Amino acid sequence: MDKGRERMAAAAAAAAAAAAAAQCRSPRCAAERRGFRRELDSWRHRLMHCVGFESILEGLYGPRLRRDLSLFEDCEPEELTDWSMDEKCSFCNLQREAVSDCIPSLDSSQSTPTEELSSQGQSNTDKIECQAENYLNALFRKKDLPQNCDPNIPLVAQELMKKMIRQFAIEYISKSGKTQENRNGSIGPSIVCKSIQMNQAENSLQEEQEGPLDLTVNRMQEQNTQQGDGVLDLSTKKTSIKSEESSICDPSSENSVAGRLHRNREDYVERSAEFADGLLSKALKDIQSGALDINKAGILYGIPQKTLLLHLEALPAGKPASFKNKTRDFHDSYSYKDSKETCAVLQKVALWARAQAERTEKSKLNLLETSEIKFPTASTYLHQLTLQKMVTQFKEKNESLQYETSNPTVQLKIPQLRVSSVSKSQPDGSGLLDVMYQVSKTSSVLEGSALQKLKNILPKQNKIECSGPVTHSSVDSYFLHGDLSPLCLNSKNGTVDGTSENTEDGLDRKDSKQPRKKRGRYRQYDHEIMEEAIAMVMSGKMSVSKAQGIYGVPHSTLEYKVKERSGTLKTPPKKKLRLPDTGLYNMTDSGTGSCKNSSKPV
C-alpha cells in the first residue's frame, strides 16, 4: 500500500511539473518553443540537404518501405471498394490534376492579355516540372529502381508517394537552381516557380477555376522575363530612365528638386570647408610641433593624409593650400578691400614720418654734439599715439577676418606663464613706451617740461620715473636691451618700472604695488588658438566644451571671452581710459591739458 501511494504521489508530482512547464511563460521558454517550431517548419529542406534525395528514394522504394508496410497488412482490406478516381474525397489533389489538365482545352478560345501573362508563369512551372521528371528518371536509371511501386501498397498510398516524391524533386531542383544562379550572379525562374507552387498548394480547385488571376506573380514574371538569363544589371540606367520620364511629365518638379539639391550641396560644402579649415590648422600645428605624426593627426582630425602632406609641403614655400569655395572668395575680396584702406593709411603715416625725419636731420647733429637725449613734446607724442592706434585698429580688423579664412602657418608656441606688474591693460602702456622711444630718436631738442605732461597722460599704474641726462655709455647699454626703451631699464620680475635716485616728483611705491602672481594654468595657452576657438564658438559651429577639447584652451577663459565679446556678461569690465581719435594733424597741446585734468593729480 505504501509503495502504491508513493507511486501515485510521484505521478501526481510529475503531472504537476508537466502542467507547470506547459504554463511557463518565461521569455527563455518562449524562445525555445519558437525555435522548435521553426525547425519543424523547415523539416523538408533539412531532410533533403542532410539525408539526401537519393537516400530518401531508396528508403521509399527500397526493401525498407516494404518491410515497414508489411506490418499493416491485416489493417486494410484486400479490395478497395470505396475508392474511385471520379469521386471527391480528402485526397483532392488527384482530382485537381485531372481537372487542371482539361482547363486549357476549355478556355483556349477565350484568351486575354492577363491570361497571356499567366501563361508565361505556367510555362516556367512546366519547365521546372519537366526538369523534375527528367531528374527522377535519371535517378531511377542510376539506382536501377522500378518506377512503379509494389502492388501490395494501396493505391492511395502509391499516389501520395508519387506526389510527395514529385514535390520533393521540384523543390530540390528549384533550390539548387537558385543557389547556382546566386553563384553565377544571374536571376532565374526559381523565385517565380516557388511562388507559383505555393499559390497552387494554397488555392483550392474552385479558386483556380473561378477566382481572379494573381497579378503579383505576373509582375515578378515580367521582371524576370525582361532580365532573362543574362548577367544581373547593377547600373543606374533604369533609375535614370525613370527620372527622365518623370522630368518630361513634370518639369517644374525637376527644377525645384534640382535647386534644392544644389542648395544642400552648397551648404554642405561651405560647412565642411569651414570645419576643415579650423581642424586643418590645428592638425598642421600639432604635426609641426611634433605632438602628433601624420597618421595620428589624420585619424584624430578625420583629414586624409594626402591633404595633410599637401598642406605641409605648401607651408615652407609660403603658400598655404586652402579649400576652394565661395565663402573663401567672399572673405578674400573683403580682406582685400580692407588691405587697400590700410595701405592708404600707412602711406599717410609714411609721408608724415618722412616730413618728421627731414625736420629732425638738423637736430640729430645737435644730439650728437650735446650727448643728451631729451623727451619730445606732448603734441608730437600724441600725433604718434594716434597713428599707432589707427594702424593697430586696421590690423585687428584684418586679423579678425583672416583667422577664420586662412590657415595659420606659424608653429605652435609653447605657452609660458606671464608675470607682469600691471593688469590686463599693460599692452597699451608698453605701446606708449615704444612710441616714446621711437619719437625720442627722431624728435628735435625741446623743452624739459614735456616730461611732466607725459607723466600726467600715462595711466597711474604705468607711470614711469626716469633719470636726468643720459650719456653715450648708458645709451649703448639701452640698445643692448631690445625689449626696453631708454625711458627706463629695470628688468626686475620682467616689469617696466624704472626708478632712480633722482626722481623729480617722488611717486610713492604703494601706488605702483604689484598684484600677486597668478597660479595654476592661468594664461598658459596660445593666443592665436584661443582666437580661433572664440571665432568657432561665436559663429555657432562648436560649443565651448567641444572647442576646449579640440583646441586645448581653458574652459572658463574661453567662456568668459565669448560672453565678453557677445555682451552677455553679468558684470562687464570697466571701460579703459582711451584718447580721442580726432585725426592726424589737429592734435594740439590743449588736448594734453584735457587728458591731464582727467587723470589723477600726482
UniProtKB/Swiss-Prot annotation:
It is found in: Nucleus. GO terms for molecular function: DNA binding; histone methyltransferase binding. Residues 106-124, 585-602 have a biased composition (Polar residues). The keyword Ubl conjugation applies. Disulfide bonds: none annotated. Residues 104-124, 495-521, 564-602 are annotated as: Disordered. InterPro entries: Homeodomain-like_sf (IPR009057), HTH_Psq (IPR007889). Keywords: Activator, DNA-binding, Isopeptide bond, Nucleus, Transcription, Transcription regulation, Ubl conjugation. GO terms for cellular component: nucleus. It comes from the Eukaryota. The keyword Nucleus applies. There is a cross-link at K242, K319, K340, K397 (Glycyl lysine isopeptide (Lys-Gly) (interchain with G-Cter in SUMO2)). GO terms for biological process: regulation of transcription by RNA polymerase II. May act as transcription activator that binds DNA elements with the sequence 5'-CCCTATCGATCGATCTCTACCT-3'. May play a role in spermatogenesis. This is Ligand-dependent nuclear receptor corepressor-like protein. The gene is LCORL.
